[in-house]
A protein has these predicted regions:
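Short, Lys/Arg-enriched N-terminal segments with co-localized hydrophobic residues
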Residues: 24-45
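Long, charged N-terminal accessory/stalk domains
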Residues: 111-114, 119, 125-231, 275
């Protein structure tokens, strides 16, 4: 059930919560009719990120920071995962709402799932592995702080060792899935040849060979074979964001993530990112008002909170961008993959918009702000008319014109 005031769910509702999709409504101009109607948007696909790591590294602290959940709601003493929906802070959307007053602000969202205890124990027992496989990416919390009361995993502080230990268990988990499937495939192929099964068999053998060399699948150039194995949702294929949890004395070391990435050899690894936070400091920050929080951050030489840093790093890792729509009733931020077209964006808002797509009217956020109004942007020629193949850029404001 929902934990009051926290926006999180416990494991009893997790399976249901993961299938819930946000619904939205927009006023839309019907091309050629002069009418405006209220239509439901398509189901909003929210990015899902699973928080994993060893025990006593600060996973739940990070979850509380991101979701503004309170400790009492999580301290059930039971091995439950918790889910929280986080609004993605975006100053550009805030500015649009000021330009178009009276409209509701609808931020893009990210779901975070906090897995209980050590991820190694979860993988070995199979508990909640299925829910982890449904994530778009993993946020692996790595301990980089000393605490006399809570000893570090393995008895000594060694972030790189902890990364390697978790990676190995993830690889073994994927290998177990592959070996089980290969046994079934080989039995079926002995009975009858099947091109699709043969392609799957070959792709799984490629994956198996890489994993046996302890190479995670995210670092393997699978090419067309990646589409063949996508349905297995292999954990080692998922992008991973290493979240370095610093001690209080290191909170101002904003370069810590870059330094650690270089030392651990993570910088050049594909589908891998690093962010640094100080869980203790950020937990204190979450209890303050906006004004006090800004002063508190400044005292540590920080320009932004961990929420902004982790979400930005997650977006970069997943290769997604934001575009905006301004309707009669709301200003909304949408998340879409980098390289997506205007036609893709129309489908993100509503499938009917995609089917009846005529054109997109697009203006850069900066140009719209400089113009001061949509009418002025149009008169200056800043509102561009684009076709369905137009590739969207981060921060563009999009108006979809479509047939009724």
């Amino acid at each position: 059930m929902l934990v009051p005031g926290s926006g999180i769910c416990n494991a009893a509702a997790l399976a249901i919560a993961l299938d819930v999709r946000l619904r939205a409504f927009l006023y839309v101009s019907m091309e050629g009719t002069g009418r405006r109607i209220l239509v439901p948007c398509r189901e909003v696909q929210v990015l899902k990120i699973g928080i994993v790591g060893l025990g006593q590294v600060g996973k739940t602290t990070l979850f509380r920071i991101l979701t503004h959940a309170h400790g009492s709601g999580l301290a059930s003493g039971r091995p439950e995962a918790h889910l929280g929906v986080v609004h993605v802070p975006d100053a550009r959307l805030d500015r649009l709402v000021k330009m178009f007053p009276g409209r509701k602000t609808v931020y893009a969202s990210v779901e975070y799932v906090d897995s209980p205890g050590s991820v190694i124990d979860l993988l070995r027992t199979g508990i909640q592995t299925a829910s982890l496989r449904e994530m778009d990416a993993l946020a692996h919390v790595v301990r980089a702080f000393d605490d006399e009361v809570l000893p570090p995993p393995g008895g000594s502080l060694d972030p790189q060792r902890n990364i390697e230990n978790v990676e190995l268990e993830i690889i073994l988990s994927d290998l177990a899935v592959i070996e089980k499937r290969l046994e079934r495939l080989e039995r079926d192929l002995k009975k009858q040849k099947n091109p699709a099964l043969e392609a799957e068999h070959l792709a799984l053998l490629t994956c198996k060979a890489a994993l046996e060399k302890q190479t995670p699948l995210r670092e393997v150039a699978l090419g067309p074979q990646e589409a063949v194995v996508r349905g297995f949702m292999f954990l080692s294929l998922k992008p991973v964001l290493y979240v370095l949890n610093l001690g209080e004395k290191d909170a101002a070391r904003t370069q810590a993530a870059e330094e650690f990435a270089a030392e651990a050899g993570l910088k050049q690894r594909p589908k891998t990112g690093v962010a640094a936070v100080s869980g203790k400091i950020e937990a204190e920050l979450a209890e303050l008002s906006d004004a006090d929080a800004a002063d508190f951050l400044a005292s540590f030489g920080l320009a932004e909170s961990a929420v902004a840093r982790v979400i930005r790093a997650s977006y970069q890792l997943l290769g997604v961008v934001s575009f905006f729509t301004v309707g009669e009733n709301e200003c909304r931020a949408w998340t879409i993959r980098s390289g997506a077209t205007a036609w893709d964006a129309a489908g993100e808002v509503h499938s009917d918009f995609q089917k009846g797509f005529i054109r997109a009217e697009v203006v850069k956020f900066e140009d719209l702000v400089a113009a001061g109004s949509l009418a002025e942007a149009r008169s200056r020629g800043l509102l561009k008319v684009e076709g369905k193949e137009y590739v969207l850029h981060d921060g563009e404001v999009v108006y979809i014109r479509h047939a009724p």
